[in-house]
């Protein structure tokens, strides 16, 4: 389940973390998916994926994987990426498959461990596990069937 944040926080994210985030749009310009991330200050070679979401009717087509591949490719071309981290709840099998598949395409191992137990969250939130993926291979196996086209600071994806 995706934690929904305020529109203000997403606007700040777009302004301050555009280099480590991506929005996929369909032919009409409607947002189809997004991934938000940041570089860990104490580990400058590590991209943390904070959120990733794909519109329900577009799931299962490789869009999430294509966005992750695009982000890592963008950062690797700048020489600033060796690893990826994210947090996933134990019940979120779709995200677990997404990140394991990403690791396989990038020739990387996956390690995970408990990070935030449910008791630390003020609402009914599941515990979160930290997934560490890396080191990332130089030339990943591409995600089939998804193509990007440049649209200013976002990316477009055919639905």
Predicted regions, residues:
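A conserved beta-turn-beta hairpin within the catalytic core of GNAT-like acetyltransferases
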Residues: 40-49, 59, 78-82
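A short, internal acetyl-CoA/4′-phosphopantetheine-binding micro-motif in the GNAT/acyltransferase core
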Residues: 51-59, 88-89
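Conserved acetyl-CoA-binding loop-helix of GNAT-fold acetyltransferases
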Residues: 54, 60-74, 97-101
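Conserved active-site alpha-helix within GNAT-family acetyltransferase domains
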Residues: 65, 90-112, 122
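C-terminal "cap" of GNAT-fold acetyltransferases
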Residues: 106-159
